[in-house]
Amino acid sequence: MSDLSHYRNIGIFAHVDAGKTTTTERILKLTGKIHKTGEVHDGESTTDFMEQEAERGITIQSAATTCFWKDHRMNIIDTPGHVDFTVEVYRSLKVLDGGIGVFCGSGGVEPQSETNWRYANESGVARCIFVNKLDRMGADFYRVVGQVKKVLAANPLVMTLPIGIEDEFKGVVNLLDMKAYIWDDTGLPENYEVVDIPEDMVEKANEYREQLIETAVEQDDDLMMAYMDGEEPSLEDIKRCIRKGTRDLAFFPTYCGSAFKNKGIQLVLDAVIDFLPSPTEVDPQPLTDEETGEPTGEVATVSTDEPFRALAFKIMDDRFGALTFIRIYSGVLNKGDTILNSATGKTERIGRMVEMHADERTELTSAQAGDILAVVGMKNVQTGHTLCDPKNACTLEPMIFPEPVISIAVKPKDKGANEKMSIAIGKLVAEDPSFQVETDEDSGETILKGMGELHLDIKVDILKRTYGVELEVGQPQVAYRETITLPVEDSYTHKKQSGGSGQFGKIDYRIKPGETNSGFKFTSTVVGGNVPKEFFPAIEKGFAGMMEVGPLAGYPVLDVEVELYDGGFHAVDSSAIAFEIAAKGAFRQSMPKAGPQILEPVMKVDVFSPEDNVGDVIGDLNRRRGMIKDQEAGATGVRIKADVPLSEMFGYIGHLRTITSGRGQFSMEFSHYSACPQNVADKVIEEAKARKAAK
């Protein structure tokens, strides 16, 4: 068995275009995994192996790659930076122990960086920071460090300083050994020399080294006291303190360089080994109750002596077949073992196991706690399922994914391709939990739901290229919701008599608005036996089932509380089905009286605008019913944060490029549901009626 202290499971994440795929490429070249480095702008990079990724120059799926550095095994996940694929980042963070946050030296802390950083904080993932692209025009390492402090409220621990900047960038000062690392112009990462620090940088290097040591020794009281008494700590003591502070998220070791020019990557790799945690040094995964989802108090201890426990964190269908990516938390998995899927209750025999290198693979006969690998040909497994030893059934903490906010209706251009389309869409749904499909019961249309326009564009593209299914795509539809604003006290009786035994159920109830995000809540305060307890579940089921279709436009209903306080029953004619029908009738009767209201999804929008165009951009956001939350001037322009209804954001990127002469950028993610203005609600209701009439 491998020594777990020599394992590092890390993710590389950042804003789109910050250079994380290029950084991964350089790491793979340095660790001997690839011989010729692919360039993203040539569509050749190793981890961007889907056609859509190679074409668009953005990473969509998190490719898992295993490589080695200084006798340590690194499992690297290269995550997407585009906001529509945030679910991939979240999914990856769930199975990682550490990460490298890549920031652009000129762009700084960009919108998606914030989202990824927030997710990483929530997941408790220790990170190093790599400020990339210091060879770029407008690059400023110190400005980016300041942004990390201000925008992310994080504590960057500067470990290297740039020597030169933009075209003059040639190397870094390593503050640990107080030496300069200078690369030549051949572009080869191994062609560098270690020399004395340039004279004009000695003072700054001493200043930053002092800050580094002062911050590090705060992790050890004895060392801090000795340092305050004038005793310089040893290099090993400094590293030990940095390691502890990094693992505790007290600070983030921060490096600089240029991945494209092959400068500075070695020191980042050393930091992964020296400062990021091994699988045994992170909090073990909690086990949860299968029924309630609540923690049981037990954990999956990272050890090869424990029973086998693993999490399926990604499903992929590629040219080799169906792949299930798993992270093993405890125990050992051998080829031929039988394992239990605790979510389905079914067992499966492990056929082939492979170690992935982007889309190439190495066959394995066994794997152990700490490993990230892919199993070939598993059936009935979905993202978030727990795989375990059949004799020691358990459930790991599940993954929770955001609900889609946008949908499109699709149908195959070839009328005979319906079955082919259904199979292909089924595979995509298994791969991506934030992508959903449903069939419109009235029209029979297939509805695809996703996290944004680009998300759905790419799915349609994959269906065409990978599965040969060309689709006719309808206009994007917003996922509106409905709710109520007034309390109602009411009564409903369901009575049916048509020979033989009849049906009878009477309910007296109160309906009122619930708390935001509370969903549907049912309570009973019936005193005595007017409604026997055995009928309560049927009444709850009747009300809950009606929450799927609201009274105004047929959208799902949010945040409603129902209290059953009295009723009546018949000894012969009352039954569960009679009370369920009564609850459905009660819902239809009372909802129009309860002040029903249309809710619309509001997006958190982050726009970058050149200074010259800020007024136009803000004016445009206001016209889109946007609420400006914040503005921040940077070196290259202004960032504007706003809440804007999703319905106003379709096609926004084209409009933004027009008013900023192609220089504007934006990202958005779902924020909350909010009541529509009456004129918008009226339009939504009219459109819903028109769709219904057309079916």
Swiss-Prot record:
It comes from the Bacteria. GTP binds at residues 14-21, 78-82, 132-135. GO terms for molecular function: GTP binding; GTPase activity; guanosine tetraphosphate binding; translation elongation factor activity. Residues 279-299 are annotated as: Disordered. The keyword Protein biosynthesis applies. It is found in: Cytoplasm. GO terms for cellular component: cytoplasm. Keywords: Cytoplasm, Elongation factor, GTP-binding, Nucleotide-binding, Protein biosynthesis. Disulfide bonds: none annotated. Gene3D superfamilies: 3.30.230.10, 3.30.70.240, Elongation Factor G (Translational Gtpase), domain 3 (3.30.70.870), P-loop containing nucleotide triphosphate hydrolases (3.40.50.300), Translation factors (2.40.30.10). Pfam families: EFG_C, EFG_III, EFG_IV, GTP_EFTU, GTP_EFTU_D2. Residues 5-280 form the tr-type G domain. Its main location: cytoplasm. GO terms for biological process: ribosome disassembly. Catalyzes the GTP-dependent ribosomal translocation step during translation elongation. During this step, the ribosome changes from the pre-translocational (PRE) to the post-translocational (POST) state as the newly formed A-site-bound peptidyl-tRNA and P-site-bound deacylated tRNA move to the P and E sites, respectively. Catalyzes the coordinated movement of the two tRNA molecules, the mRNA and conformational changes in the ribosome. NCBIfam families: EF-G, PRK12740.1-5, small_GTP. Belongs to the TRAFAC class translation factor GTPase superfamily. Classic translation factor GTPase family. EF-G/EF-2 subfamily. This is Elongation factor G. It comes from Alteromonas mediterranea (strain DSM 17117 / CIP 110805 / LMG 28347 / Deep ecotype).
